[in-house]
Amino acid sequence: ENSFYRTFQWNQNVSFFKEENRTCIEIPDQNIYVYGLSYEHLEIHEALYDDWKKSDKRGFHVLMAHGGDEQHIPLDSRKLAEGGFDYIALGHRHQHQNLFKDWCLYPGALEPVDRNDLGEHGYIEGTYDQGTVRTRFVPFASRSYQNLYLTVKEGVTQYTLEEMLRNEIMKRGGKNIYHVI
């Protein structure tokens, strides 16, 4: 109840889901309907989005859903698709992933959060025109976590090993964070 999100004085153009139940926020001048719920517990094991459907109102219908594993609102992509939404914006996973091309995807984290967040990180840029959604992934991260494999032969000195490592890091980029294997 005393969360910063609940006590902060937000601008009038900022909306958020205040309760952990089905909510639809309407942007009337643009005929946009955004569906979602507040995530108020550390873990939620129920598949809360399975039976969600868009309303019959004419416009662009977006589902914002956080979850995707057994501890954090399990998601069934087939049931999400049956909801009839024009776009489904997913959150929780740090890796970019398309469940359905252009209209149901995880953007991932803008920057890698931990050493398991390998690969590119960025954001989703999208357009909606005459009933068609088009999206593209835009790389954004200033650095990445990478596995770095070194083959070390018997007799290699520590100095030589450090030089091999330094050279390989400089080839790949000095800003990145490496897990040496």
Kindly label every feature range from the protein language model.
Residues 1-127:
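His/Asp/Glu-rich metal-coordinating catalytic cores
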Residues 21-30, 107-179:
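Binuclear metal-dependent phosphoesterase catalytic core
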Residues 63, 179-180:
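Structural beta-sheet core signal
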